[in-house]
Amino acid sequence: MKNRIIIFIIGLFCLQPVASHADVAGLVPCKNSKEFQRRLDSSVKKLESRLSKYEPNTPPYLALETQINKTKNRFTQYGNAGLLCGTDGLPHLIADGRWSHAGEFMVPGLFFLYIAGWIGWVGRNYVQFASQTDKPTEKEIIIDVPVALSFISTGYIWPFAAFKEFTSGNLIAKEDEITVSPR
């Protein structure tokens, strides 16, 4: 079992994609893109035209000013984040495995997998709990909230708990425990 884990980890490092030095499909940094700047100017211009319809210091006027500042800040952050824009002026996410673009796709992707694993682990534990009660079907339909919250509060350590169960052999069901529907 440990040999498989070691081989898997070594395989992960060996199979990392080699960074290519070619451009990324004609994309340019957003801060250098004329179309990106045109989109910023267009968005701000639309908001300023709406702003001219209101008296200064009125709630709608102040709300639009805030919206203009948020729009400018968003475009500035996109430009400073090193995102690449296409000919349409929109930022494009690069998902090719390069570490220089890890913040665009890999980091949010790993965060998504962590949250999805948390939800799955908590659900798995709750279903296992429900199967050991007097009325398991009822416990699955009508969720026992205090019990579910206790599972949720401990679910954040799911990667370690899953690894522990995997190494102890409790994570994967045995062949004779898996039911097969007759056909």
From Swiss-Prot:
The chain crosses the membrane at residues 102-122, 141-161. It is found in: Plastid, Chloroplast thylakoid membrane. Pfam families: PSI_PsaF. GO terms for cellular component: chloroplast thylakoid membrane; photosystem I reaction center. The keyword Secreted does not apply. One of its GO terms (biological process) is photosynthesis. Residues 1-20 form the signal peptide. It comes from the Eukaryota. Gene3D superfamilies: Photosystem I PsaF, reaction centre subunit III (1.10.8.110). Keywords: Chloroplast, Membrane, Photosynthesis, Photosystem I, Plastid, Signal, Thylakoid, Transmembrane, Transmembrane helix. It is a multi-pass membrane protein. Belongs to the PsaF family. This is Photosystem I reaction center subunit III.
